[in-house]
């Protein structure tokens, strides 16, 4: 063998079998940035049709987690695939930099503003802290192979962006959507600030559930509403009963609310302490059961509408409250009578406005009753629940009390229960200028993926309250408005003033607002106007980036955002704040497509939790397995639902990666010595199987590009794996090894094969590039340096487009796709019999076998098209076809109807060079150890191959 070894075309490549990604990827990253890969992409795509994926900014606090990695990798895959599809797809990453979490971190270091440091110093410390957090997260994202404007990201705290956020506020005010109101808002007593809807999360909480009596102020007038018969009016005090789980709100009660069409019943409670109570008829039995009242009877009925404006005594204060009517009253639970405190609930506030009720708010920003609150001054509201219950008992107003577990709003940061609290706030009004209706209409023009996203955001927009955009914080973009000290009206020149402020902020940052002397801007008006000192909700900051970033950054060339891509929780967050602000400013949605992904869970479907110990950190994965494994995991998941990750799941991704890598390595190793400029075989002269393989690559490419276009990365990876493992690995690459290794070096048989391998790897490397970016770059650098045209290969795979050199077989060809599909089935059936023969020691390897295939006429005609090259497809030393009628006794049935196969151990000698057993081994003078085919390949013109 040694004398012929040098005549074999053995594979050779500098592309290693082991990826060793954790070590190699940082070296590749270094080269990407040294050679300005992102800049090269931008240059290559300049002037192409644009595709803008606008980055939802992560919060600049803490290390990135696996959810961040999922999100950013998905964005990167989509942008790279769009680039390969010929789009100019810039990516400007962003960060959300203002807000409470950063304030809290800075407070730990320097204390609260106004104590050890001034507010100005505090803001500067916040800016420094956020900048450091951005840098840390930036490096983590870059390590994942994500390409973008990392040197010029957008940060909501950049002076220019802060100025544009202020301008956005001005436009919303100009368009009539800004509202100043004294309204109940979600209030976190730990934050000391209002919260947006998106900052509220619901968790179970145990609260006191109480049924409370409100005595009738005028019994006779009330009883007259029930049309009772003379002498059947009952006995004892008359009360209407409310149910609540927030006893602490009772000091602010200003009404009891009924529904106009509900029937209410006057019940006589019997026994030693008779009384008469009023509840909704539907709920009467529930109320009686709950209160443990067994003996009672009904005295009469009245509609809610009949009881409107009847007066009742407050249970512990010396004033009366009216019965009012509201549509929000239901019979799902409670008594059908709703305790109404306009200062502590949005529905209460809304119905209170109709009846001109006082909006009482006896609670301070820290959750403590104000000093003038009768009975409860100085107590924290949640601790005061017990005191309120005791007071109700003392006053004889408590009908029933028990502990009740229910879903309750909590602060997303502190994880503590929040309250509704009426305060003066700034709102983006949903209805005063038709914003809600316009938003709902615009939603229909957006493509929501998955489709359920549309109904989800529609429901949220339909039901949402006014957007409270003001915060009582230090580190945030100011609500840069001047209001009249007496009327609270905006200054008549607000538009011009906002632009002047924005110009100063553009130069000096938000601190400029607090530094500006009102007289500088207002002149003589300064005496009548005061600055608003509230800051903007951070959801406003990020929500207006469609204007502050997309409209303003030169990278986007004035194009609108095509896509927003975030987690499904952003229907109530960024998707919604962006939509509302864009409609308020421009009258249209800020995006054309909205794509959402689910949350990351562990292999058992549980949320990531340090206490459970199931947290998978991106850094740990890249340090151990490499970023390409993490990227392949992201691409392989159906990300529209929950996305599972665990060591076992990542191991499966690593296994899949190895199969793809090994396929690519086979291609590269067998292109050794191939020069596309001089060695390409014309299509019409290629061996039939080689043309089929290129056709399979074309079919795969069509499906893969379609899947990329539909953002279906899961389908991309499935098709890629099928192509590498099944179409190539299990069939084509297996069949061509003999020809590639043993054919005449540089002869037609070998060059045809290499031509196919070259075309396929040109396509394969591009399919991989959006997902396995590092490995694709590594492959690219091992591919032939020159192209068929003689031009040099581009420096990077990412600057090009999908390979356009593939071609398919015509269906009219004799050896078309259907033919090769049938041959794969025949080969599969034969392989089962060869495996059995190996198991029973009839043969060693398949090249020790000779086959006779007994086939029916139709199948035999197809198989015979391969002529004497059938044995190469079946990987045996000999294979002949005979009619089924001549079937031998030794022939075995296969799982193909009309096909029997006889497997025999060959008696021919083994060729030292190709290992085939053929009768001519030892018959050729001077080459006694090799077969005639090998002699031709070593000393002659080389074997001719037409089919395989």
Curated annotation (Swiss-Prot):
Q: What is its EC number?
A: 6.1.1.5
Q: Which PROSITE patterns match?
A: AA_TRNA_LIGASE_I
What this protein needs as a cofactor is: Zn(2+)
Which InterPro entries does the annotation name? aa-tRNA-synth_I_CS (IPR001412), aa-tRNA-synth_Ia (IPR002300), Anticodon_Ile_BEm (IPR033708), Ile-tRNA-ligase (IPR002301), Ile-tRNA-ligase_type1 (IPR023585), Ile-tRNA_ligase (IPR050081), M/V/L/I-tRNA-synth_anticd-bd (IPR013155), Rossmann-like_a/b/a_fold (IPR014729)
Q: What class of enzyme is it?
A: ligase
- Which parts of the sequence bind Zn(2+)? 911, 914, 931, 934
**In which residues does the motif 'KMSKS' region occur?**
607-611
Report the SS bond pairs: none
* Pfam families given in the database record: Anticodon_1, tRNA-synt_1, zf-FPG_IleRS
A molecular function (GO) term: tRNA binding
UniProt subcellular location = Cytoplasm
Q: Any idea which UniProt keywords this protein has?
A: Aminoacyl-tRNA synthetase, ATP-binding, Cytoplasm, Ligase, Metal-binding, Nucleotide-binding, Protein biosynthesis, Zinc
According to its UniProt entry, the protein's GO biological process terms are:
isoleucyl-tRNA aminoacylation
Looking up HAMAP family in the UniProt record yields: Ile_tRNA_synth_type1
Q: What does this protein do?
A: Catalyzes the attachment of isoleucine to tRNA(Ile). As IleRS can inadvertently accommodate and process structurally similar amino acids such as valine, to avoid such errors it has two additional distinct tRNA(Ile)-dependent editing activities. One activity is designated as 'pretransfer' editing and involves the hydrolysis of activated Val-AMP. The other activity is designated 'posttransfer' editing and involves deacylation of mischarged Val-tRNA(Ile).
Q: Which family does this protein fall into?
A: Belongs to the class-I aminoacyl-tRNA synthetase family. IleS type 1 subfamily.
Descriptive protein name: Isoleucine--tRNA ligase
Gene responsible for this protein: ileS
